[in-house]
Amino acid sequence: MTDARGTPLGAATDAAGVSETMLGPAALADIPPCVALPPMVPVVADRAYDSDPLRGHLAGRGFRLLSPHRRGRVRPATNDGRRMRRYRRRYVVERTFAWLHGYRRVVTRFERMAELHHGFVHLALAFICLNRLL
């Protein structure tokens, strides 16, 4: 989870087989309470996050999910073109992932314990935040 400039706010890690929609609420819960977010902040995500339960969970926490709909969507579309213009700024999140992949220990998971890997991810994100500040 990043802000509009690409500064990391929170992260969630899990096994490779877990759906990304399950990690979204965990990444939001990882944002520290000292970060002041305005109400109804848009969360820009890719097509994998398009699920109605996740939209409901985010709306309950004061966020609005902006993601393109999946092709086989059964329910009617909830996005319009005006709000989806913000999806163009998705490159900011992808750029933060590229910065994170600059840390070899995070890219290849050498640790067997999930807590250690999660700690190294947070350490790499802290270094990214320091580089953004300096």
Q: PLM ranges: what are they?
A:
Residues 3:
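Short, acidic, Ser/Thr-enriched surface-loop or helix-capping motifs
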Residues 12-35:
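Active-site beta-loop-alpha junctions of metal-dependent nucleic acid enzymes
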Residues 17, 33, 37-113:
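Helix-centered, glycine/charged polyanion-binding patches within enzymatic domains
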